[in-house]
Protein backbone atom coordinates (compact mmCIF):
# COMPACT_ATOMS: atom_id res chain seq x y z
CA UNK A 1 0.00 0.00 0.00
CA UNK A 2 2.80 2.40 0.93
CA UNK A 3 4.53 1.73 -2.40
CA UNK A 4 1.33 2.61 -4.28
CA UNK A 5 1.02 5.88 -2.34
CA UNK A 6 4.66 6.75 -3.04
CA UNK A 7 4.24 5.88 -6.72
CA UNK A 8 1.14 8.09 -6.94
CA UNK A 9 2.96 10.98 -5.27
CA UNK A 10 5.90 10.56 -7.65
CA UNK A 11 3.54 10.54 -10.65
CA UNK A 12 1.76 13.69 -9.45
CA UNK A 13 5.10 15.45 -8.93
CA UNK A 14 6.28 14.39 -12.39
CA UNK A 15 3.10 15.59 -14.10
CA UNK A 16 3.16 18.87 -12.18
CA UNK A 17 6.76 19.49 -13.22
CA UNK A 18 6.06 18.47 -16.83
CA UNK A 19 3.04 20.77 -17.03
CA UNK A 20 5.17 23.69 -15.81
CA UNK A 21 7.68 23.15 -18.63
CA UNK A 22 5.15 23.45 -21.47
CA UNK A 23 5.72 26.74 -23.31
CA UNK A 24 3.79 29.04 -25.61
CA UNK A 25 4.84 29.34 -29.27
CA UNK A 26 5.69 32.30 -31.50
CA UNK A 27 6.97 34.84 -29.00
CA UNK A 28 8.39 36.97 -31.82
CA UNK A 29 5.02 38.62 -32.48
CA UNK A 30 4.18 39.23 -28.82
CA UNK A 31 4.42 42.65 -27.17
CA UNK A 32 5.26 43.10 -23.49
CA UNK A 33 5.27 46.29 -21.41
CA UNK A 34 7.58 46.58 -18.39
CA UNK A 35 7.69 49.42 -15.83
CA UNK A 36 10.73 50.45 -13.80
CA UNK A 37 13.37 49.66 -16.43
CA UNK A 38 16.01 52.22 -15.44
CA UNK A 39 17.77 49.65 -13.25
CA UNK A 40 17.33 46.49 -11.21
CA UNK A 41 14.84 43.76 -12.11
CA UNK A 42 13.11 45.81 -14.80
CA UNK A 43 16.31 46.68 -16.62
CA UNK A 44 17.52 43.07 -16.64
CA UNK A 45 14.06 41.85 -17.68
CA UNK A 46 13.92 44.27 -20.62
CA UNK A 47 17.35 43.16 -21.87
CA UNK A 48 16.58 39.47 -21.32
CA UNK A 49 13.22 39.45 -23.09
CA UNK A 50 14.61 41.54 -25.94
CA UNK A 51 17.29 38.86 -26.49
CA UNK A 52 14.62 36.16 -26.42
CA UNK A 53 12.74 37.85 -29.25
CA UNK A 54 9.82 39.55 -27.52
CA UNK A 55 8.77 43.00 -28.70
CA UNK A 56 9.61 44.87 -25.51
CA UNK A 57 8.24 48.28 -24.54
CA UNK A 58 10.34 49.40 -21.58
CA UNK A 59 9.09 52.23 -19.37
CA UNK A 60 11.85 54.28 -17.73
CA UNK A 61 11.54 57.16 -15.28
CA UNK A 62 14.57 59.06 -16.58
CA UNK A 63 15.97 59.98 -19.98
CA UNK A 64 19.40 58.72 -18.94
CA UNK A 65 17.95 55.34 -17.97
CA UNK A 66 16.14 55.13 -21.29
CA UNK A 67 19.24 55.96 -23.34
CA UNK A 68 21.43 53.52 -21.41
CA UNK A 69 18.92 50.71 -21.97
CA UNK A 70 18.57 51.42 -25.69
CA UNK A 71 22.36 51.26 -26.04
CA UNK A 72 22.33 47.66 -24.74
CA UNK A 73 19.36 46.29 -26.68
CA UNK A 74 18.16 45.66 -30.22
CA UNK A 75 16.07 47.92 -32.43
CA UNK A 76 13.01 45.82 -31.53
CA UNK A 77 12.95 47.35 -28.06
CA UNK A 78 11.20 50.68 -27.57
CA UNK A 79 11.46 52.86 -24.48
CA UNK A 80 8.95 55.34 -23.10
CA UNK A 81 9.34 57.83 -20.27
CA UNK A 82 6.81 57.08 -17.56
CA UNK A 83 6.12 58.34 -14.07
CA UNK A 84 3.57 55.84 -12.75
CA UNK A 85 2.33 58.39 -10.20
CA UNK A 86 1.30 60.82 -12.95
CA UNK A 87 -2.20 59.88 -14.20
CA UNK A 88 -1.94 61.91 -17.42
CA UNK A 89 1.46 60.41 -18.21
CA UNK A 90 0.04 56.91 -17.67
CA UNK A 91 -2.99 57.62 -19.86
CA UNK A 92 -0.89 59.09 -22.69
CA UNK A 93 1.53 56.16 -22.52
CA UNK A 94 -1.34 53.67 -22.74
CA UNK A 95 -2.66 55.45 -25.82
CA UNK A 96 0.78 55.31 -27.45
CA UNK A 97 1.11 51.60 -26.62
CA UNK A 98 -2.35 50.96 -28.10
CA UNK A 99 -1.37 52.60 -31.39
CA UNK A 100 1.96 50.77 -31.38
CA UNK A 101 0.71 47.21 -30.76
CA UNK A 102 -2.42 47.50 -32.91
CA UNK A 103 -4.78 44.53 -33.08
CA UNK A 104 -2.23 42.17 -31.55
CA UNK A 105 -2.81 43.67 -28.14
CA UNK A 106 -0.40 43.32 -25.24
CA UNK A 107 0.74 39.82 -24.34
CA UNK A 108 2.48 40.80 -21.13
CA UNK A 109 2.24 43.60 -18.57
CA UNK A 110 4.98 43.48 -15.94
CA UNK A 111 4.35 45.93 -13.10
CA UNK A 112 7.84 46.22 -11.67
CA UNK A 113 8.31 49.91 -10.75
CA UNK A 114 8.71 50.41 -7.02
CA UNK A 115 10.37 52.39 -4.23
CA UNK A 116 11.28 51.54 -0.65
CA UNK A 117 10.58 54.90 0.94
CA UNK A 118 11.46 55.45 4.57
CA UNK A 119 12.20 52.41 6.73
CA UNK A 120 12.01 53.40 10.40
CA UNK A 121 10.00 52.76 13.58
CA UNK A 122 6.35 53.73 13.16
CA UNK A 123 6.35 56.36 15.93
CA UNK A 124 9.15 58.23 14.14
CA UNK A 125 7.03 58.79 11.06
CA UNK A 126 4.35 61.11 9.75
CA UNK A 127 1.60 60.20 7.30
CA UNK A 128 3.63 61.92 4.56
CA UNK A 129 6.40 59.34 5.04
CA UNK A 130 3.91 56.69 3.91
CA UNK A 131 2.75 58.48 0.76
CA UNK A 132 5.58 57.89 -1.73
CA UNK A 133 5.75 54.07 -1.58
CA UNK A 134 1.97 53.79 -1.57
CA UNK A 135 1.64 56.20 -4.51
CA UNK A 136 4.28 54.35 -6.56
CA UNK A 137 3.96 50.73 -5.46
CA UNK A 138 0.18 50.58 -5.18
CA UNK A 139 -1.69 53.40 -6.94
CA UNK A 140 0.89 53.57 -9.73
CA UNK A 141 0.62 49.83 -10.29
CA UNK A 142 -3.18 49.93 -10.25
CA UNK A 143 -3.37 52.89 -12.64
CA UNK A 144 -0.97 51.31 -15.14
CA UNK A 145 -2.92 48.05 -14.96
CA UNK A 146 -6.32 49.68 -15.49
CA UNK A 147 -5.05 51.61 -18.51
CA UNK A 148 -3.28 48.63 -20.11
CA UNK A 149 -5.88 45.98 -19.25
CA UNK A 150 -7.98 46.32 -22.44
CA UNK A 151 -4.85 45.58 -24.49
CA UNK A 152 -3.99 42.55 -22.34
CA UNK A 153 -7.56 41.24 -22.64
CA UNK A 154 -7.37 41.60 -26.42
CA UNK A 155 -4.29 39.33 -26.49
CA UNK A 156 -5.62 37.02 -23.74
CA UNK A 157 -2.24 37.68 -22.19
CA UNK A 158 -0.50 37.91 -18.84
CA UNK A 159 -0.29 40.42 -15.99
CA UNK A 160 2.70 40.03 -13.68
CA UNK A 161 2.81 42.07 -10.48
CA UNK A 162 6.11 42.32 -8.64
CA UNK A 163 5.29 42.36 -4.94
CA UNK A 164 7.74 41.36 -2.19
CA UNK A 165 8.15 39.15 0.82
CA UNK A 166 7.15 42.42 2.49
CA UNK A 167 3.68 41.71 1.12
CA UNK A 168 3.53 38.51 3.15
CA UNK A 169 5.26 39.59 6.36
CA UNK A 170 5.84 43.06 7.84
CA UNK A 171 9.51 43.63 8.60
CA UNK A 172 9.73 47.37 9.24
CA UNK A 173 7.80 50.58 9.73
CA UNK A 174 6.96 52.81 6.77
CA UNK A 175 4.83 52.68 3.65
CA UNK A 176 6.63 49.87 1.83
CA UNK A 177 5.02 46.94 3.63
CA UNK A 178 1.46 48.36 3.58
CA UNK A 179 1.85 49.06 -0.15
CA UNK A 180 2.97 45.50 -0.87
CA UNK A 181 0.23 43.93 1.27
CA UNK A 182 -2.24 45.93 -0.81
CA UNK A 183 -0.58 44.81 -4.06
CA UNK A 184 -1.17 41.21 -2.99
CA UNK A 185 -4.86 41.93 -2.45
CA UNK A 186 -5.21 43.76 -5.77
CA UNK A 187 -3.39 40.92 -7.52
CA UNK A 188 -5.75 38.29 -6.12
CA UNK A 189 -8.94 40.16 -7.04
CA UNK A 190 -7.58 40.95 -10.51
CA UNK A 191 -6.64 37.30 -11.07
CA UNK A 192 -10.18 36.13 -10.33
CA UNK A 193 -11.80 38.91 -12.36
CA UNK A 194 -9.65 38.20 -15.42
CA UNK A 195 -9.99 34.42 -15.44
CA UNK A 196 -13.11 34.49 -17.64
CA UNK A 197 -11.19 36.54 -20.24
CA UNK A 198 -8.34 34.03 -20.49
CA UNK A 199 -5.91 36.47 -18.85
CA UNK A 200 -3.44 34.92 -16.38
CA UNK A 201 -2.38 37.08 -13.42
CA UNK A 202 0.73 36.19 -11.43
CA UNK A 203 2.47 37.69 -8.41
CA UNK A 204 6.23 37.56 -7.79
CA UNK A 205 7.51 37.82 -4.21
CA UNK A 206 11.27 38.46 -4.22
CA UNK A 207 13.32 38.26 -1.06
CA UNK A 208 16.08 40.77 -0.32
CA UNK A 209 18.10 41.50 -3.46
CA UNK A 210 20.97 43.87 -4.15
CA UNK A 211 19.22 46.58 -6.16
CA UNK A 212 18.94 50.34 -5.94
CA UNK A 213 15.73 49.84 -3.99
CA UNK A 214 17.61 48.38 -1.02
CA UNK A 215 20.65 50.69 -1.19
CA UNK A 216 21.95 50.74 2.43
CA UNK A 217 23.50 54.20 1.99
CA UNK A 218 20.23 55.82 0.90
CA UNK A 219 18.26 53.94 3.55
CA UNK A 220 20.74 55.07 6.21
CA UNK A 221 20.61 58.70 5.08
CA UNK A 222 16.81 58.75 5.27
CA UNK A 223 16.81 57.20 8.73
CA UNK A 224 19.42 59.65 10.03
CA UNK A 225 17.48 62.60 8.61
CA UNK A 226 14.36 61.52 10.50
CA UNK A 227 16.31 60.89 13.71
CA UNK A 228 17.68 64.44 13.69
CA UNK A 229 14.17 65.90 13.69
CA UNK A 230 12.63 63.62 16.32
CA UNK A 231 11.29 65.13 19.53
CA UNK A 232 13.49 64.90 22.65
CA UNK A 233 10.92 62.53 24.20
CA UNK A 234 11.22 59.99 21.36
CA UNK A 235 15.01 60.23 21.38
CA UNK A 236 15.04 59.58 25.12
CA UNK A 237 12.83 56.51 24.73
CA UNK A 238 15.04 55.00 22.03
CA UNK A 239 18.39 56.24 23.32
CA UNK A 240 21.30 57.84 21.47
CA UNK A 241 22.88 54.43 20.88
CA UNK A 242 19.79 53.11 19.10
CA UNK A 243 20.43 54.78 15.77
CA UNK A 244 24.04 53.59 15.59
CA UNK A 245 23.12 50.01 16.50
CA UNK A 246 20.18 49.92 14.08
CA UNK A 247 22.35 51.19 11.23
CA UNK A 248 24.90 48.51 12.03
CA UNK A 249 22.12 45.88 11.87
CA UNK A 250 20.98 47.32 8.55
CA UNK A 251 24.46 47.03 7.05
CA UNK A 252 24.77 43.46 8.34
CA UNK A 253 21.44 42.44 6.80
CA UNK A 254 22.21 44.00 3.42
CA UNK A 255 25.55 42.19 3.25
CA UNK A 256 23.71 38.87 2.94
CA UNK A 257 21.21 39.83 0.23
CA UNK A 258 20.70 37.85 -2.96
CA UNK A 259 23.04 39.02 -5.73
CA UNK A 260 21.56 37.14 -8.70
CA UNK A 261 18.77 39.32 -10.12
CA UNK A 262 18.11 36.73 -12.81
CA UNK A 263 16.24 34.64 -10.21
CA UNK A 264 13.41 37.18 -10.36
CA UNK A 265 13.59 37.51 -14.15
CA UNK A 266 13.31 33.71 -14.45
CA UNK A 267 10.02 33.94 -12.55
CA UNK A 268 8.83 36.64 -14.95
CA UNK A 269 9.90 34.46 -17.88
CA UNK A 270 7.91 31.46 -16.65
CA UNK A 271 4.86 33.63 -15.98
CA UNK A 272 5.11 35.03 -19.52
CA UNK A 273 5.90 31.88 -21.49
CA UNK A 274 4.47 28.88 -19.62
CA UNK A 275 1.19 27.40 -20.82
CA UNK A 276 0.37 27.00 -17.14
CA UNK A 277 1.84 29.97 -15.24
CA UNK A 278 1.83 29.90 -11.45
CA UNK A 279 -0.31 32.26 -9.43
CA UNK A 280 2.65 33.07 -7.15
CA UNK A 281 6.42 32.92 -7.51
CA UNK A 282 9.02 33.20 -4.77
CA UNK A 283 12.55 34.34 -5.64
CA UNK A 284 15.63 34.26 -3.45
CA UNK A 285 17.01 31.78 -0.94
CA UNK A 286 16.00 33.94 2.03
CA UNK A 287 12.41 34.17 0.81
CA UNK A 288 12.08 30.42 0.23
CA UNK A 289 13.82 29.21 3.39
CA UNK A 290 12.89 31.89 5.93
CA UNK A 291 10.38 34.62 5.02
CA UNK A 292 7.67 32.60 3.29
CA UNK A 293 7.75 29.71 5.82
CA UNK A 294 7.68 32.29 8.63
CA UNK A 295 4.63 33.97 7.07
CA UNK A 296 2.64 30.76 7.63
CA UNK A 297 3.58 30.49 11.32
CA UNK A 298 1.55 31.80 14.28
CA UNK A 299 1.86 35.55 14.88
CA UNK A 300 3.38 34.98 18.33
CA UNK A 301 6.22 32.96 16.80
CA UNK A 302 6.71 35.54 14.04
CA UNK A 303 6.99 38.30 16.64
CA UNK A 304 9.42 36.29 18.76
CA UNK A 305 11.79 35.56 15.87
CA UNK A 306 11.68 39.04 14.34
CA UNK A 307 11.96 40.91 17.64
CA UNK A 308 15.11 38.94 18.46
CA UNK A 309 16.81 40.95 15.70
CA UNK A 310 15.51 44.31 16.89
CA UNK A 311 17.72 46.77 18.74
CA UNK A 312 16.62 47.16 22.37
CA UNK A 313 15.22 50.53 23.40
CA UNK A 314 17.13 52.43 26.08
CA UNK A 315 14.14 53.70 28.06
CA UNK A 316 10.71 52.64 26.75
CA UNK A 317 9.12 53.58 30.10
CA UNK A 318 9.92 57.26 29.53
CA UNK A 319 6.54 58.04 27.99
UniProtKB/Swiss-Prot annotation:
Residues recorded as binding NAD(+), renumbered to this chain, are 34-58, 83, 180
Keyword Cell membrane present in the record's keywords: the answer is no
Q: Which residues bind substrate?
A: 164
Q: Which N-terminal residues, if any, form the signal peptide?
A: 1-20
Q: State the Gene Ontology terms under molecular function.
A: alcohol dehydrogenase (NAD+) activity; all-trans-retinol dehydrogenase (NAD+) activity; androstan-3-alpha,17-beta-diol dehydrogenase (NAD+) activity; androsterone dehydrogenase [NAD(P)+] activity; oxidoreductase activity; testosterone dehydrogenase (NAD+) activity
Q: What Pfam families would the database entry show?
A: adh_short (PF00106)
Q: What is this protein called?
A: Dehydrogenase/reductase SDR family member 9
Organism lineage: Eukaryota, Metazoa, Chordata, Craniata, Vertebrata
Catalytic activity annotation: 3beta-hydroxy-5alpha-pregnane-20-one + NAD(+) = 5alpha-pregnane-3,20-dione + NADH + H(+); 17beta-hydroxy-5alpha-androstan-3-one + NAD(+) = 5alpha-androstan-3,17-dione + NADH + H(+); androsterone + NAD(+) = 5alpha-androstan-3,17-dione + NADH + H(+); 5alpha-androstane-3alpha,17beta-diol + NAD(+) = 17beta-hydroxy-5alpha-androstan-3-one + NADH + H(+)
Query: Which species is the source of this protein?
Result: Rattus norvegicus
User: Biological process (GO) annotations?
Assistant: 9-cis-retinoic acid biosynthetic process; androgen metabolic process; progesterone metabolic process; retinoic acid biosynthetic process; retinoic acid metabolic process; steroid metabolic process
InterPro entries attached here?
Answer: NAD(P)-bd_dom_sf, SDR_fam
Self-association and partners: Homotetramer.
Protein role: 3-alpha-hydroxysteroid dehydrogenase that converts 3-alpha-tetrahydroprogesterone (allopregnanolone) to dihydroxyprogesterone and 3-alpha-androstanediol to dihydroxyprogesterone. Plays also role in the biosynthesis of retinoic acid from retinaldehyde. Can utilize both NADH and NADPH.
- Location within or outside the cell: Microsome membrane; Endoplasmic reticulum membrane
Gene Ontology cellular component annotations, sorted alphabetically: endoplasmic reticulum membrane; intracellular membrane-bounded organelle
The UniProt keywords, alphabetically, are: Endoplasmic reticulum, Lipid metabolism, Membrane, Microsome, NAD, NADP, Oxidoreductase, Signal, Steroid metabolism
Q: EC number(s)?
A: 1.1.1.209, 1.1.1.53, 1.1.1.105
Tissue specificity is: Highly expressed in epithelium of estrus uterus.
**Per the similarity annotation, which family is this?**
Belongs to the short-chain dehydrogenases/reductases (SDR) family.
Amino acid sequence: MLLWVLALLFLCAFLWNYKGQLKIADIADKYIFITGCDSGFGNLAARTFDRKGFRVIAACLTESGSEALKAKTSERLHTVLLDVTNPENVKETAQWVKSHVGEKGLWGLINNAGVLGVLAPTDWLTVDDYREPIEVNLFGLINVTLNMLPLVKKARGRVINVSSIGGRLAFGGGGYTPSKYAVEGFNDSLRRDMKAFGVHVSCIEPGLFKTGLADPIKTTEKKLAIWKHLSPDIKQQYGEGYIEKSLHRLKSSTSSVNLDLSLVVECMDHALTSLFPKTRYTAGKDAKTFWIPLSHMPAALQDFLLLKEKVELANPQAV
